[in-house]
Amino acid sequence: MNRFKAGFGLLAVMALAGCTSEKGKTPADSSASAQTNDHGGLTGAGATFPYPIYSRWFSDYAAKTGVKINYQSIGSGGGIRQLSEGTVDFGASDAPMNDTELAGAKGGPILHFPTVMGAVVVTYNIPGLAAPLRLTPAILADIFAGRVTKWNASAITSLNPGVQLPASDILVVHRTDGSGTTFIFTSYLAATNPAWKAGPGAGKEVAWPVGLGGKGNEGVAGQVKQTPGAIGYIELAYANQNKLPYAAIQNASGAFVVPSIASVTAAAASIADTLSASSDYRISVANAAGKDAYPISSMTWLLVYKNQRDPVKGKELVDFLRWSYETGYETAASLDYAPLPEKLRQRLIARLGMISLGSA
């Protein structure tokens, strides 16, 4: 498993402390990217899910080109709001914008650019448990709905023969902010469980029936780490950074699969063949077919205005995206993200031609 570079060190400290403040509101977020170039650099805001890889990319890109990118890791909902209001140059989200959100954007049409793929993992704090816990989508829905409340419930022990599970309460931990990670997790539950689809349903924010809240992936990781009996959902990189275990989830083929670069890549095996440069890239790979596919996988997106009013910033944004597809992707696996398939990256490079520079 990777260990993040020095610029990301404070994130682990915050998670260990159970801190629930947003990265975008702390000095750590700007450690590698707060400076600006002669004409202001680029500003962005949004998802915490890809913050580790974006932090690395922005630092590497600044070192190569001198273009500084200031990114606030405030959650997908916040990134969509700031882009829609025109206060940042780009947004970032783990949930694609819906039609209503797109229609409300002040700067006109918005394009979705997938950057990497990742996994949302189900992490837990069960002292003494060595092997990965095995869970089905039905059991997950029952736990997060408050219908299964004890770790030694028969619905859980029957999936984990030979494993001694405690008779203690299950404490659910969920996000409190508008979150793409929540969208990925609840979309998966809604896709696999009719009762969950009926309510709470899927979204960046839902009315959780039970549980405690944490802000950002950091906050949820911190809550789970310091609370025996807790269960929550976070991005894979945050689980590895905080040495948190994660469950093997039953996929659409019936196999129990742990999250990994290989199992996330397997979830996207056939995507590239269905897309072109002009496709609508608001797509889902949740509960994908294939015996090796991890079912709670997702793309994450950068969101950019199709018509860039500032030609200098517009070109910088296009150049950065091109760099991410041609070079930046090489660092993804070292930070527990799955790079996009080569064929898909080439189609996204062609898609950059849809961005108009300097037009209102």
What are these regions (language model features)?
Residues M1-F8:
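Bacterial N-terminal signal peptides that target proteins for export
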